[in-house]
Swiss-Prot record:
Coiled coil: none annotated. Pfam families: PRA-PH. Its main location: cytoplasm. HAMAP family: HisE. This is Phosphoribosyl-ATP pyrophosphatase. Pathway: Amino-acid biosynthesis; L-histidine biosynthesis; L-histidine from 5-phospho-alpha-D-ribose 1-diphosphate: step 2/9. GO terms for cellular component: cytoplasm. The keyword Transport does not apply. NCBIfam families: histidine_hisI (TIGR03188). Gene3D superfamilies: MazG-like (1.10.287.1080). It comes from Leptospira biflexa serovar Patoc (strain Patoc 1 / ATCC 23582 / Paris). Belongs to the PRA-PH family.
């Protein structure tokens, strides 16, 4: 789980610096509509992968979805800590 926090920091850095040859920076440059489109695509791929017996494929697709959700969170200024607190509040 610690890696997700490191990824969040890296994503913030990409958003600030917008390096030329970065897929993540490209997502930030293109804006929220592009990020949402990617989340939709990845969510669909998770659904399809979940119907198949290949666990490795499902893990790959879930990782892609989580990555793009984190990109959206950074774009919108929402931290993983905020999400964790919301989940904790719901399940405590």
């Amino acid at each position: 789980m610690e890696f997700l926090l490191k990824l969040e920091d890296l994503l913030r850095k990409r958003k600030e610096e917008l390096p030329e040859k970065s897929y993540t920076a490209e997502l930030f440059r293109d804006g929220v509509d592009r990020i949402l489109k990617k989340i939709g695509e990845e969510a669909g791929e998770v659904i399809i992968a979940a119907k198949n017996p290949n666990e490795k494929e499902l893990i790959h697709e879930i990782a892609d979805l989580i990555f793009h959700l984190e990109v959206l969170m950074v774009e919108k200024g929402i931290s993983l800590t905020t999400i964790a607190k919301e989940l904790e509040k719901r399940h405590s």
